[in-house]
Amino acid sequence: MLFDVLRSFGVRCAGFIPLGDADLISKREYGFPEDAFVISFYLPYYTNVKSNLANFASARDYHQYYAELFRACESFMNEKHPGRYFRGFADVSPFAEVLLAAKCSLGVIGDHGMLITKDASSFIVLGEAVCGLSEDELLAEGISKGEGKVGGCTHCGECRRQCPADAADDKSRCISSITQKKGELSESEKDIIRKTGMVWGCDVCALACPVTKTAMKNGTLETDIPYFTEGRLGTVDEGLISSMSDEKYERYSFSWRKREVMIRNIRIASGTDFEGENI
């Protein structure tokens, strides 16, 4: 089954809705079949590692893993359903991924804007695929039919209360956003990095969620996918980032920015401002 292929990569559940019910955010013409369905699924990535990187950033770049997953799915489709349409996306997607996943009944949308799943909370990376199989064929391939409804969280307010940057009402203050910015940061932005010590991304709002605490207690939060458990980075410093070969640096998702950005963040977090150029 198609779901067996997904499961072999660590996908725990997958759902689908008609293409017409999915929210497109791209004006690009992709040539999708009008009667196609969109499948949504996710990979859990959390491990209990102490780091000044967000949990996803301490693991190897998930985009590369998704590329392998999609190649395996395409091979399966070519063998079992030759000529049928299949195209996968992850992160760089024509769809509003969180909204799509919620409509596919994979979870609910939290006040922090991320999907919350029962087993892995928000420590997931989403993927989706446009597929030319019929509804009955998708069900036979082990993919569940989504309800098409968007549910919200319980609005307990923990993510808002625990955010160290008070970013609930001003996303420009979010540490994840600030640490990925190019150029010179404002003093208020630098203060946020100094306050938290984080040099790429942040997990505070996701860790604050009661669903995360329940998943942790139940033993479902941590991933068992070797790609995400092996090669993890702990606390990084300037020496480590500077000494990485280009090949190793590019294994991690923060490599979409030049390493000067990481070094800037590390210096700010350690209390030494970096007056860099061409960052």
Where are these regions (language model features)?
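Long, compositionally biased charged/polar accessory segments in the mid-to-C-terminal portions
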Residues: 255-273
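Acidic, Ser/Thr- and Gly/Pro-rich intrinsically disordered linkers and low-complexity segments
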Residues: 244-257
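Amphipathic alpha-helical scaffolding segments comprising HEAT/armadillo-like alpha-solenoid repeats
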Residues: 245-248, 274-279
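Immediate flanking context of iron-sulfur cluster ligation sites
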Residues: 141-154, 192-202
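Active-site-proximal loop/short-helix segments
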Residues: 165-189, 230-236
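Iron-sulfur cluster-binding cysteine motifs and their immediate structural context
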Residues: 158-179, 197-225
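Auxiliary alpha/beta "docking" domains used to position bulky ligands
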Residues: 1-152
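Extended alpha-helical surfaces
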Residues: 213, 220-236, 240, 251
